[in-house]
Amino acid sequence: MKKVIKKIALAYSGGLDTSIMIPWLKEHYEHAEVIAVICDLGQQEDLDAIKNKALKSGASKAYVVDVKNEFATQYLWPLVKSGALYEDQYILGTISRPLIAQKLVEIALTEQVNAVAHGATGKGNDQVRFEYSIKALAPQLEIIAPWRTWDIKSRQEAIVYAKAHGIEVPVTPKAPYSRDHNIWYISHEGGVLEDPSQEMPNDVLLMTAPVSQTPDEEEVVVLDFKKGVPVALNGQELSPVDLLNSLNQKAGQHGIGVADIVENRLVGMKIRGIYEAPAAAVLYKAHKLLESLCLTRSTLHLKQSLQQTYANLVYEGRWFSQTKQALDAFIDVTQQHVTGCVKLKLFKGNIIPAGMHSPYSLHHPELATFEEDNVYNQKDAEGFINLFSLSAKIYSQVHQGGNYD
């Protein structure tokens, strides 16, 4: 027997797609009640207007949930501590998807809904990220993905549907790019960007100045970390949200944090994207420098070997997984002594190290110096080298010089 769905919680963005989903869901599920869930991730939009639009589109309720601080502390700071970059380039701004799914589920359970819905298309990664998280958090909820089932196939058809249902459609040219924005990044896809042979146009960037338009003087920033987490900027302790906003502004005006990449989507295709993440780029650089000072060689190398695994987990939306929990436990141990201060210069798209110190620094000048010292006995190296190279020596003897061609 088909399950009767009377109430649906919809992850709502305010765009054309999720706006027409409200009447569509009510039509296709016997006039079910639709509750819109809007997450404030620092996307710098008029969220009150978006809430009103949801209600005008037919939602019975619309929640606006401020998750900026939670996003920073529970998602972005673990990401910084991990040092993970997807395919060594992508700063993983879509880490917001599991958080959106989490809030959607929380409200769904509070409102006792039968199902949840999202606006991700059937060609992208987000459908996987949302649905993986929902199934992990509330497997009893039914998931509705209209883009995979409805007959609307184009923007023009969506506009016709919207007008037929009294949904306001702004009379403006279609944006040339598809964008996603939160406090961590802005992504740009589509339009001319779909062709990797074409240079990025000047009109793409919103948060970052083109290098040709950056100041001719460098700017110094100082970041303090405690157990791998950024806590202060230029000597001033700031909330996570304020720190990110301030650093985005400072680094953005110097043209820092722009990535033009072709990435492998989870669903099998390659896609080109432009990503702006000024604060993220600076934080990653500073954190990496501090780790080089505070972690042992074996710990640092093991952590680096796991970074792509962590990046894959985030990219694929497997935030709520046992594997991710286990990796977090390891990373947290590595960060116990990643405390200190890093000084950087920002100039013409470059992040230049300008000094760092930590009470837990493993760098000892008396050992590393090229001058005469009374600490390191260079004769000790001979025995180490003999043992370290013993297997190579034996192999060469057995194989009469070895064959390494």
From Swiss-Prot:
The keyword Cytoplasm applies. ATP binds at residues 11-19, 119. L-citrulline binds at residues 90, 125, 129, 178, 187, 263, 275. NCBIfam families: argG, PRK00509.1. L-aspartate binds at residues 121, 125-126. SUPFAM superfamilies: Adenine nucleotide alpha hydrolases-like, Argininosuccinate synthetase, C-terminal domain. GO terms for cellular component: cytoplasm. It comes from the Bacteria. The gene is argG. GO terms for molecular function: argininosuccinate synthase activity; ATP binding. Keywords: Amino-acid biosynthesis, Arginine biosynthesis, ATP-binding, Cytoplasm, Ligase, Nucleotide-binding. It catalyses: L-citrulline + L-aspartate + ATP = 2-(N(omega)-L-arginino)succinate + AMP + diphosphate + H(+). GO terms for biological process: argininosuccinate metabolic process; L-arginine biosynthetic process; urea cycle. InterPro entries: Arginosuc_syn_C, Arginosuc_syn_N, Arginosuc_synth, Arginosuc_synth_CS, Arginosuc_synth_type_1_subfam, AS_cat/multimer_dom_body, Rossmann-like_a/b/a_fold. It comes from Legionella pneumophila subsp. pneumophila (strain Philadelphia 1 / ATCC 33152 / DSM 7513). Pathway: Amino-acid biosynthesis; L-arginine biosynthesis; L-arginine from L-ornithine and carbamoyl phosphate: step 2/3. Homotetramer. The lineage of its organism: Bacteria, Pseudomonadati, Pseudomonadota, Gammaproteobacteria, Legionellales. This is Argininosuccinate synthase. Its EC number is 6.3.4.5. It is found in: Cytoplasm. Belongs to the argininosuccinate synthase family. Type 1 subfamily. Its main location: cytoplasm.
